[in-house]
């Protein structure tokens, strides 16, 4: 009955797609439990590269059942685009299961997301503009539309009308936009529902039954710990819980069925969008890391902000997620550096802090306290045994492990699927 949770331990883009695909070939189900198509991950198989946004990474593994859980907000149009794109490349998507209780991103959610972000100006959050936040807001305000609502025309019309009543007032009076038509929106959603219906299931029941039968389920989180609405750098966060606890609420599986929690971290740190980032690099160093790591968002194409490894962030991620293992990715990107700084603590207004400040004013004022380690020049992409890594590279990994307080079980040494060093198995 292994239930394995896989989460990002930083601000996202850590390489969860590669880690999920590594584990996903050995599991029976891969379930997304939060977020929507604002999460981008790339899976590389041989010469093929698959950019996924809404679908679980396990869709690439033919013997795995991919599941979109109730905690995900689903944009049907994006889902179908992604399915069509994969099927045109020979990937079978008929195995996909979508929770009947998942909330829908309607066209008006995307409109509201974009006009609100523009209206905020310099106070913007840095959203992807894909309607994620407004859809989650409707969920909390109890005016959201769920997947099963798409199959009852009269019921759906009533729900759309209720949802648009206040939104149209805002669009017209606050944002000087035209109101959204209730009938047109209902008809559009009904058509999307017709195509979605074959994939819809009671996924909580499916996953619990699978675990009770001794099958292995991988719970895949979108975004990452530092973007969690409760535990991240609020307000510069996403609208859901990408931390390990979200795996339970986002799939309807109880915590006693979780046996492993795996955090994915880069050997350095990146962030997209607004918000504090203590180890952020500017100038030539930041440009070098961005170029070496090809650091551009899968979902947005935006250049990622880059910085040195932050052990305070990783310790915090280990704490709030209860990490049992770390997958360290993109270690190869650091090849060629003579010295590699890593952040071991913060200076906050003259005081050393080894823990994560929860006050965002303090976190914004945090200055990294660095220690420096010698780098390496050797190509490590073909190394498959930890002991065959350059000594200075081994020392760097061991120091990250020591500072994070959690064992590093897998190391990514390049972009390909087989560019890994597996120290410990991630499946019991």
Curated annotation (Swiss-Prot):
EC code: 6.3.4.4
InterPro entries referenced in this protein's UniProt entry, alphabetically: Adenylosuccin_syn_GTP-bd, Adenylosuccin_syn_Lys_AS, Adenylosuccinate_synth_dom1, Adenylosuccinate_synth_dom2, Adenylosuccinate_synth_dom3, Adenylosuccinate_synthetase, P-loop_NTPase
A cellular component annotation (GO) from this entry: cytoplasm
Localisation per UniProt entry: Cytoplasm
Cofactor list: Mg(2+)
Keyword Protein biosynthesis: no
Binding annotation for GTP: 12-18, 40-42, 304, 330-332, 412-414
Taxonomic superkingdom: Bacteria
GO BP term (any one): 'de novo' AMP biosynthetic process
This protein's UniProt keywords: Cytoplasm, GTP-binding, Ligase, Magnesium, Metal-binding, Nucleotide-binding, Purine biosynthesis
Residues the record lists as binding IMP: 13-16, 38-41, 128, 142, 223, 238, 302
Binding site for substrate: 298-304
Entry similarity comment: Belongs to the adenylosuccinate synthetase family.
Subunit details: Homodimer.
Protein name as it appears in the record: Adenylosuccinate synthetase
Natural source organism: Bifidobacterium adolescentis (strain ATCC 15703 / DSM 20083 / NCTC 11814 / E194a)
């Amino acid at each position: 009955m292994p239930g394995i949770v896989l989460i990002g331990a930083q601000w996202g883009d850590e390489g969860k797609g590669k880690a999920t695909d590594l584990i996903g070939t050995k599991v029976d189900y891969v379930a997304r439990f939060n977020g929507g198509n604002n999460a981008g991950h790339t899976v590389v198989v041989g010469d093929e590269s698959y950019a996924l946004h809404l679908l679980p990474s396990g869709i690439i593994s033919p013997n795995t059942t991919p599941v979109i859980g109730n905690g995900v907000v689903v944009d049907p149009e994006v889902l179908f685009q992604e399915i069509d794109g994969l099927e045109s490349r020979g990937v079978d998507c008929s195995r996909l299961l979508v929770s009947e209780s998942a909330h829908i991103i309607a066209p008006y959610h995307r409109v509201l997301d974009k006009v609100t972000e523009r209206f905020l100006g310099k106070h913007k959050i840095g959203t992807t503009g894909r309607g994620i936040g407004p859809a989650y807001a409707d969920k909390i305000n109890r005016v959201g539309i769920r997947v099963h609502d798409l199959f009852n025309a009269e019921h759906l019309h009533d729900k759309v009308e209720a949802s648009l009543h206040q939104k149209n007032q805002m669009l017209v009076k606050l944002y000087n936009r035209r109101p959204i038509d209730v009938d047109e929106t209902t008809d559009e959603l009904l058509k999307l529902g017709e195509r979605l219906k074959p994939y819809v299931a009671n996924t909580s029941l499916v996953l619990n039954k699978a675990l009770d039968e001794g099958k292995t389920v991988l719970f895949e989180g979108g975004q990452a710990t530092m973007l969690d609405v409760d535990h991240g750098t609020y307000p510069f966060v996403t609208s859901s819980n990408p931390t390990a606890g979200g795996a339970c609420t986002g799939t309807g599986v109880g915590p006693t069925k979780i046996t492993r929690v795996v955090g994915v971290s880069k050997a350095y740190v990146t962030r997209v969008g607004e918000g504090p980032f203590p180890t952020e690099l500017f100038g030539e160093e930041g440009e070098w890391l961005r170029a070496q790591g090809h650091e551009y968002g899968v979902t947005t194409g935006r250049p990622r902000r880059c910085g040195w490894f932050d052990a305070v962030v990783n310790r915090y991620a280990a704490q709030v997620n209860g990490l049992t293992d770390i997958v360290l990715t993109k270690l190869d990107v650091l090849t060629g550096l003579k010295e590699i700084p890593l952040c071991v603590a913060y200076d906050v207004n003259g005081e050393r802090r080894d823990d994560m400040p929860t006050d965002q004013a303090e976190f914004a004022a945090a200055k990294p306290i660095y220690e420096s380690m010698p780098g390496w020049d050797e190509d490590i992409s073909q190394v498959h045994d930890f002991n065959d890594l350059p000594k200075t590279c081994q020392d760097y990994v061991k120091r990250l492990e020591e500072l994070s307080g959690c064992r590093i079980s897998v190391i990514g040494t390049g972009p390909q699927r087989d560019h890994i060093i597996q120290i410990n198995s991630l499946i019991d």
